[in-house]
Amino acid sequence: MSKGISEEIIASFKQQLEQHPIYSAISTVDDLRCFMEHHVYSVWDFMSLIKYLQSKVAPDEYPWLPDGDTSIKRFINELVLEEESDQALPDKNNSDGFSSHFELYCEAMKEIGGNPHDVHAFLDQIKKAGINKALANTSIPEASRIFTRSTFKFIESGKPHIVAAALALGREHIIPCMFRSFLQEIGITEQDAPAFHYYLNRHVHLDEDFHAPLSLRLLNELCGEDNIKQNEAIDAAKAAVTARLDFWDAVLEEIECNRKRVKTG
């Protein structure tokens, strides 16, 4: 009988990501701004992974029939709820609202002088012409373009277990921690960047407490005891890690080029 995909397997992949030099390379607000203007596309395409999985695990079909692991259904539904319509930062009147994590991230970008215009132009083009034309014809950064294409290749496989493998590797707990440490180091307080700090607090809480163990359960639920699916999922996890490492390499190179432009400009 197959034992499934273990936490150790996923952890071994994540270790490569967490040791990437990009996390220690960000030392100025300009570096952070450059990072975020690339990373925002990864924040956006994560929603497509979970929306695809929701359509497979908890489809909106009727007549409805009870079927499958209800804890997995709840996980994917809650993940969509949190990512698409989480509690927003209270406004000046302390009124509560709701916001996607992508929109929160864009607000955080603006607080440190980043410009989300290009990613919004990219989304506008998706509405008009679809994802493939948008990736080919917009001013999306090259590193982000390549990474986003890799995400949609997982989805286009039409295999939920492959998409779940990409999901399991789609979050890196080190990023919110890196952001928080950097903001503290250069003195950007919660008063200076309330949306940024709020975004980080939400992610650390949700990722560490809920998402990681349940994403592995979802992956094993979709693979079952099928060795072929398990091997495909492991291969997809490796591919997801490679895509992310290549992404970080390219973003780090762009950060270094940006530093040179600032010095010579």
PLM region descriptions:
Residues S2-G265:
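Non-heme di-metal
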